[in-house]
Amino acid sequence: MISDFDRRRPVVRIVLGSTQFAVFLGVLVVGLGPILWTVKGALSPTQELIKDPVRLWPSQPAWAVLGKAWSDLRIGHFLLNTVLLAGGSWLVQLVVCFMGAYALSVLRPKMGRFLYGAVLATLFLPGSVSLVALYLTVLDLHLANTMWAVWLPAGAHAFTVLLMKRFFDGIPRELFGAAQVDGAGPWRLFWQIVLPMSKPIIAVVSLLTLMGAWKEFLWPMVAISDTEAHPISVALPRLAEFAEENTVIAGMFLALMPPVLVFIAFQKYIVRGVGFTGVKG
């Protein structure tokens, strides 16, 4: 630890400033590096991309490659599939996990501790362990090759329940007690107290859910056999066999932009929600 007196010394201030700048620069390179390389690869001719892959910027940017990737790889069609799959997964997971966390944190049933432990126990199970059982269940319910096969399993997400429960645990119990004295039941507590106060955690959970659903690869590939209904994460590797390298990278860039823009648009709410989640409970 550095005392306030030492912080006022010129040498210490220079060292601290240099260290902070170096750390910030490193984080910036690690975070933006892959995105910038994707932009560079998308605008580079295929021959230049192969001969000089570490070049910082193409000698003659080929902006037409983005349009070619959009039309040849049918990026718009597969992006629409991805939006539908991610949106449905987000809605199902938000409703199911919100209700589950509300019941465990606010209603607190008699077997609440046991149920909470059972939910957390699923965090230790790799997804590959339950893949076969999940697929057989989808077949039994005749949901294979439909979007419901992706939407419904998204509701069973223990980590989302954990995040929401921790947030709800931080709401003062006195609010619930006062509302119950006024005759409020479980649904009134939910609609008038819990839901209005949950905007920060809803923003965080929405981001995590959408990002996870957007990049999901294995389960959509297994559950949906129709190639026309595949999301962009499944379609791009298949289409890469028939397209040039720069066209594939341009498709990757176009697929990357929607979640990046969503994060930029809702960054304020997401950062605030992460802070609340880490402090409360």
What is the predicted function of each stretch?
Residues I2, R8-V11, L16-G281:
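A structural signal for multi-pass alpha-helical bundles of membrane permease subunits
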